[in-house]
Amino acid sequence: MNEYNFSDIEKSTQDYWRKNDTFKTIEDNTKEKFYCLSMLPYPSGTLHMGHVRNYTIGDVIARYQKMQGKNVLHPMGWDAFGLPAENAAIKHKKSPYEWTKSNIAYMRSQLDSLGFSFDWSREIATCDEDYYKWEQWFFIQLYKKGLAYRKNSVVNWDPVDQTVLANEQVVDGRGWRSGALVEKKEIPQWFLKITDYADELLQDISKLDGWPEAVKTMQINWIGKSKGLTVKFKIKDSNQEIEVFTTRPDTLMGVNYLGIAPEHPLALEEAKTNSKLAAFIEECKKTSTMEADLATQEKKGFKTSIKVIHPISAETIDVWVANFVLMGYGSGAVMSVPAHDQRDWEFAQKYNIPLKQVIESNDKKLKIDLEKQAFTEKGILINSGEFDGLNFKNAYQAIKKYLTEQNKGYETTNFRIHDWGISRQRYWGCPIPMIHCDDCGAVPEKEENLPVRLPTDVTLTEAGSPLKDIPEFINVACPECGKPAKRETDTFDTFFESSWYYARYTCPTANQMLDQEANYWLPVDKYIGGIEHAIMHLLYARFFHKLMRDQGLVKSDEPFKNLLTQGMVLKDGAKMSKSKGNTVDPQELIDRYGADTVRLFSMFAAPPEQSLEWSETGVEGANKFLRKVFNYAELNKDIFAKNITLESQKLTKEDKKARFEIHSNLKQAIFDFDKSQFNTVVSACMKILNTLNNYDNLSESVKVEGFSILLRILAPFTPHLCHYLWQQLNLGEDILHTSFPTVDNNALEKDEFLLVVQINGKLKAKLELDASLSPNQVEEIVLADQHVKSFIDNKQVVKVIYVPQKLINIVIK
């Protein structure tokens, strides 16, 4: 008997796919389309087990949908720009382009070795000018619409990587890649007006029925829509005002001080003549601007000479510069109510600022001890003059009315989300297609001159971008007036590239950003990736899709219909990482066990949304199962050569039992496939093989039917072996183009059933009975059974409880 030689099988199968262009996809309006997409990888140089799991999930879905008769698009590409390539190029003394392209070639071969059904004719790399030309074109359209703009902004500055970081890229006050302590710095930055779309991005979350609730909640919180009042505090002895936003105007009468950001113009102005304040502001620049960090870091402040007038009581209130106030949120100023806000309370305790209680609990028995903590619940107003006795709702309306009539405030809807800063001060990215002219200001490059090419003949150092030192790149004529001007040297944030790549896959060679194929394929039907992308990539892609829609490039409102967020791959309970020394090289596993085994293990070990714990014995178990599948085919190959058909009237009792088990498992597998519960689909395959092996006298026709069902369920998971056996057993040319099996409901109708017999709830017997028996007939047979009678003779039968074709319980006393 032949043995399972995975390397020969996988090589010959991949050769077949390559020769026949098996995975190439074209538009076909006669079929239902299905666009399956896994998040594109960064070309680091080697695949890790997280990649393997992610892309196996996508491949299983794509193959299953193809076997359902759908026209499936399953592309792959490379998120190729960004700092890691630049840093690696410096380290290895290569150009980022050369390093990236070399990595892409190797990783593509690794993906191929795993048998993924990618349509490589649609491959894109975001560093290719044919790709980034169109995002430059798109940026210019956004600029013309006023959706892209440049302004001075206080940013998170990574002093090691010499670039700006988004708030989300700062972890515990440090750069997410370099680990350096992040500083605050004011520089000119390019932005996209995501705030113009904040309401729509929030409202349309309700349309995302196929998204996990956790991701939707994270986006809702990140957009952070809140209704409140903007309150005007007049600066004493000045015509100026400080505006603050609050969602709790019921606490307005308890304001003890205002807090302003260290970068606030009023703080900077006073710092010119106050060296201690200037030093405090410099110290604040070294602290994190992440909200999570602000919540836990020590609250620090500096009392200024500025005083403001309370808009209702006319009391004089101090203004403090506080390290927990962000310039980017609202006006960069907050009203502080120490009695009713815990952060303000902590600050007030530190600096001996008095508290004023203006809210009491609805529960009159509750004692509020402001010496221990702030009382933050909503309740009834006290110490608030004419507003005393009002609850939150009535106080909100009354204070809004007063402030509006006095021109001291107005109702506002605020968003937590800010405009998206897209400038990066590094070389390896898409050049921003703008030119700076002393006379004309910022001017877009002429569209006929696109793409603005990134120079490749550069010398990289760790001290920022070399673009500013390349005369032939930076020195250009102004497109408006023709005078000497300077090209923009910032490059796009790499999230810019990954926000629209899914759309370019639909028409990768189009001589425009997108063509009509985009509307055939979009939206993506199934998108697979990690939940860590919930509030950056997934939100930016939704924003970009709406921008493209409003540009007339796509018709749909949302990019991704269904989202699957896969769990991490763990080893010894921790995420695999080089720093922990707990990685497993997929290539070693492929060489040792074969790609099908690696794929099968990654699908069987855990449900896709949960973390997968690495297990050597689990891999060996997957390999053992595939050897059993191969051996069953070897032992029964003569049967398949006979071209046998199933005749239901000739089926034996054993055949019917086996078919019941096979079709029950098929039914479960189809249900689990549609729910993306792939581990239980694999379990169904194992049960079917057990059924085929456990019955000694199965008809040949049932063996053929059962094994062909098994191969087709298993094919999306282990495509090489199933393709090979399908051909070897003369079942067809290509299993991928075979219809997925359907359940024979007749096989699920039993002639007999196994009845569990209980007496007073305790198991006493199991009886095989005819399925056509009525409940009364079943009861008669059970009570007449000799074994059962031995337990109930001389006892009174109180009642008989019958669960049809499952269980009967006889209650006696």
Curated annotation (Swiss-Prot):
Residues that, per the record, bind ATP: 578
Disulfide bonds: none
Cell location: Cytoplasm
Keyword Cytoplasm (UniProt): yes
EC number annotated for this UniProt entry: 6.1.1.4
GO BP term, pick one: leucyl-tRNA aminoacylation
Gene for this chain: leuS
CDD domains tied to this protein: Anticodon_Ia_Leu_BEm (cd07958), LeuRS_core (cd00812)
GO CC annotations, alphabetized: cytosol
HAMAP family named among the record's database cross-references: Leu_tRNA_synth_B
Primary site of residence: cytoplasm
Protein name per its UniProtKB record: Leucine--tRNA ligase
Family indicated by similarity: Belongs to the class-I aminoacyl-tRNA synthetase family.
Organism: Francisella tularensis subsp. novicida (strain U112)
